[in-house]
Amino acid sequence: MIIYDKNLKEGLSEFGIEIPIHHSRAARTFEKLKDHEILGPKIDQWLVSRISETVTRKDLLRVHSDEYVGRLYSDKLEDEIIRTFELIDEKGHYYRYNPHNATLPLTQLFERLLFKVAGTVQCCRLALKKEFCFAFGGGMHHAKRDYGAGFCMVNDIVVALRKLQAENLIRTAWVIDLDAHKGDGTAVLTREDSSITTLSIHMARGWPLDGEAYDQQGRLNPSFVPSDIDIPVGTGEEHLYVAKLQAGLEKLIGIGPPDLAIVLAGSDPYEKDELPSTGELRLSLQQLKERDILVYHFLKDQGIPRAYVTAGGYGEHAWEVDYQFIEWALLDNLKKI
């Protein structure tokens, strides 16, 4: 199943934000799937066209602090958005932001982000019923308990899992994070939670690992809190990426299969990605396909329900990564119908 709701907008330009996240990532992928000679005529078998889930303040409070959630629902919201999306630099100047070009108030961005969280929750529910689901949007893995970071205001991954746990739909889960950047927020939020196991394969250097690991008081930088399984990939190690990932996945086997796996299928490791901070990892389209097929079969062969979210992907070519995997996965799933 694929969740594609036309009301979910990915782009940021309406808010005057110049980060290269585009509506076209989901739209171009969907249009090509709709026109596919095999998948197009069977669209009613794989498309969910409406996000019907709702996410409440209570859902956020299972993951984020009362103080932080309170700021998101107050007149402090705009300040939190500016900080999370890094719209003002150290000198107090606008950075990747021109409010004069905005057609929507900045605070409406929070509503859009909550809609993404709802999509992630719905994707997880459908994965439990249908074994596989892919949702456009989601994967906000940098948000931590008390603050947002790296364009992520709330951590939809952990919000979704804790919501399903509260409803007794799942007990255990894996988070397999394929984004170019380390899933630091998810690692921090789940480090004392044995019910959620995290794996992150990411750039060994660069944001969010570009600071000091410890502050002057000897406290660990939250971005350096380890996932249960971390797979750092160094500059020039692209040829080792798939083998490193396979070795990391095999470590999960000894833990025992979870009730659900969430996969952050980031397209930002792509060599054509346009966000400067992804430049330490440049995978080809073929390498990304090998990545995605490896993870898919690893989970499917163990009978683990799998919910996919898009996570990072920047610029005009991000959709290419999504399309090649979704086309392949849908054709695989339609074999059973």
Predicted ranges, named:
Residues M1-I337:
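HDAC/HDAC-like amidohydrolase catalytic core signature
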